[in-house]
Amino acid sequence: MASRERSPALRIGIISDTHGSLDPRAYAALADCDHIIHAGDICGPAILRELETLAPVTAVLGNNDFDEYGSAVGHFAHPVLEGVRFLVGHKPGDVRVSFAGSAALAPGDPLPDVIIHGHTHVPELKTGPDARPAGIYLCPGAVYRPRSEFGRTLAKMDVEAGRILRTWVENLDEKVLMEA
């Protein structure tokens, strides 16, 4: 993103599946972020400490994570950033919300604007009917052992005053691969 001028919006970096290894290029790519979301399979508290040197971090447990992070990291997170509601979980089946409900949301919880998951190691960006009931459904891919032709990826999102201005997935060479 170095070639585009940055807006004054809050920039969120979204990462998943580090598996105990934070690629230096991923760290550098997240340096312009005001908040970081990690969608699980962190695999070591050192990863979160390293990310926290850049920005505040919201993280969830993945299927390879254990109780080594304390109570601040659970199976789901529901941050509200600049008025935008997020639902973050590791496995896609756990965060796919239907009108019948989900383990990720309690009765009466507001529906999220953005649903984020990890686990698949494949980037995915859906909007419109494919993202329902959210406006954006996102998997940032993986920075460790990617499972797609895109290689190692992460996502970013600019939000401001309750609006999602831009969402994109980029590889670690900062080439934009998907955008909404």
Identify the function of each model-found stretch.
Residues 61-111:
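Glycine/small-residue-rich loop that forms an oxyanion/phosphate-binding "nest" at active or ligand-binding sites
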Residues 3-13, 78-87, 129-137, 159-168:
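Beta-strand-turn-beta hairpins that frame and shape the catalytic cleft
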Residues 1-57, 65-76, 83, 150-153, ...:
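N-terminal active-site segment of His-dependent metallophosphoesterases
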Residues 15, 86, 115-117:
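A composition/secondary-structure signal for short, hydrophobic, low-basic-content segments
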Residues 16-20, 40-42, 63-65, 91-93, ...:
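Active-site metal-binding loops of divalent metal-dependent hydrolases
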Residues 58, 92-168:
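Conserved beta-sheet core of the metallophosphoesterase superfamily
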